[in-house]
């Protein structure tokens, strides 16, 4: 496929790539195949406490893409609420090992609108991102740095799903989602390393629609049919407003 398409990156996509029992074997195979092609090997959705330094060291000699970690929440309190099982110490250790392995680009995934979330939890996203950026400058000697560190903090919005522990939790409104995103952005702009942090968030309209589809009953079938009749098929519709489809 690489030879026929010209793709320059292979992504090992999973809810937790590091939990795949044959990860090391797969990475060894990909390294052998890609080492002369300068093809990126991307390892997203890594569970930081299970992140393999050995695997990271093996792929560092190939053209690097960014590493992706998913702290999910900015504070320890909220990570405990959602049973994430990660401490700030473990998160910073995982990031430090990545920096020592030669990476200077890290993506962080968080979620806004989680049950019991407070403004302090939201600001914690900015604070944790700043600490990770600071860890780069504290870990990597100036003469060994490959440019500035790049931290991309991305937030999606919490959508309660059936048959999950939070299935009865309330979902935020579009306006509440947007305000939380603005709060996060303002908090990041106040951080010491804010120039090293890029922030983006998921579209609020899409999250509201997903929540409706996730918990709707049989009556939602008529809505889906109507949307199809108005031209919606498998398009992401990211370039247009969702409101005109109502």
Role assignments for model-derived ranges:
Residues 243-244:
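Conserved small/polar residues in nucleotide/adenosyl-binding loops
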